[in-house]
UniProtKB/Swiss-Prot annotation:
Enzyme class label: transferase
Transmembrane regions: none
Catalytic activity: N(6)-acetyl-L-lysyl-[protein] + NAD(+) + H2O = 2''-O-acetyl-ADP-D-ribose + nicotinamide + L-lysyl-[protein]; N(6)-tetradecanoyl-L-lysyl-[protein] + NAD(+) + H2O = 2''-O-tetradecanoyl-ADP-D-ribose + nicotinamide + L-lysyl-[protein]; N(6)-hexadecanoyl-L-lysyl-[protein] + NAD(+) + H2O = 2''-O-hexadecanoyl-ADP-D-ribose + nicotinamide + L-lysyl-[protein]
A single GO cellular-component term on record: chromosome
Pfam families to which the protein is assigned, alphabetical: SIR2
Stated name of the protein: NAD-dependent protein deacetylase sirtuin-2
Residues holding Zn(2+): C193, C198, C219, C222
Species, as recorded: Danio rerio (Zebrafish)
Assigned EC number: 2.3.1.286, 2.3.1.-
Amino acid sequence: MSEEVSKRVEEEADTPGLEGQSDDSSDEGDASGDTEMDFLRSLFSRTLGLSPGDKVLDELTLDSVARYILSGKCKNIICMVGAGISTSAGIPDFRSPGTGLYANLQKYNLPYPEAIFQIDYFKKHPEPFFALARELYPGQFKPTVYHYFIKMLKDKGLLRRCYSQNIDTLERVAGLEGEDLIEAHGTFHTSHCVSFLCRKEYSMDWMKNQIFSEEIPKCDSCGSLVKPDIVFFGESLPSRFFTSMKADFPQCDLLIIMGTSLQVQPFASLVSRVSNRCPRLLINMEKTGQSEFGMGLFSFGGGMDFDSDKAYRDVAHLSTCDDGCMTLAELLGWKKELEEMVKREHALIDSKDAKKTDKEASQSSKSAVAEAEKTDKTE
């Protein structure tokens, strides 16, 4: 402890109100302990410059968050998103009982559900992962309302960054660029040979062709497995996650958390990296992130606090992600614009898919004709 902090501890220990605590009863002893802990938290918060300061939100409601966004004081929004933002696109989340991904993997005969995303298991038994990838491959789904809401934040100059746990690339399909995104758990956008001596890179189209031809992707240079650049259990997160985190979160003036259970570290602990004045909005089916992430004394309110008497910046809006986004858009006066964006972009995707289907059908027809002509000549 520094000399300055030690001095302040001694000075504030003499503060009236901390003297004369009685030990006559266990209740009074507990109260004394709570008071001393509150005192220490307060002291370290002030000493390290982490005290809440003035409230930014006038009330802990979605309406207040909307007013804050419209005030002009909110210019660096960070979005933290998980699988819940993609469920309305038809992509299952991981943990929902009965419908989540982990609850529906019995057909792959795994030793346990998480094995399908463990790097050691994948290297020995890649078949279950690639079978699942055929079912969930990016490009089979359309972005949701929330994906386009993030794009709208970018278009309005309000988005600092989107930190995503998802590997479905729907943020990119919705119009976000690589610089707008931190894909914390990786992406299907690129793939690499798993051999440390090779590491040859492959495109998304190459991987897609391999997966839908029902072949196990192998490197054409060394013969090793090729794996999409998603982060498996047992692998490190992308280095950009850590470098961007240090630059982004101190600048954040509104954190929007959506569709994540906040159970997977280190992603979950990002909520504690914004300043203590920064409002945090959770849009989810249930409240989450309320633990202190094991930070003990130095957890200066790092966990979400929606309901206590000391709550001052955390807002929970319990709904589906799409409904919550549309409600917020309406409060911001952006609802019609968002609805039109979703309709327009989905129509473009349908048009591209139709052209692609026609092209594939034409190529298939030409191949069939060529094969028939070849057969006729042979006969």
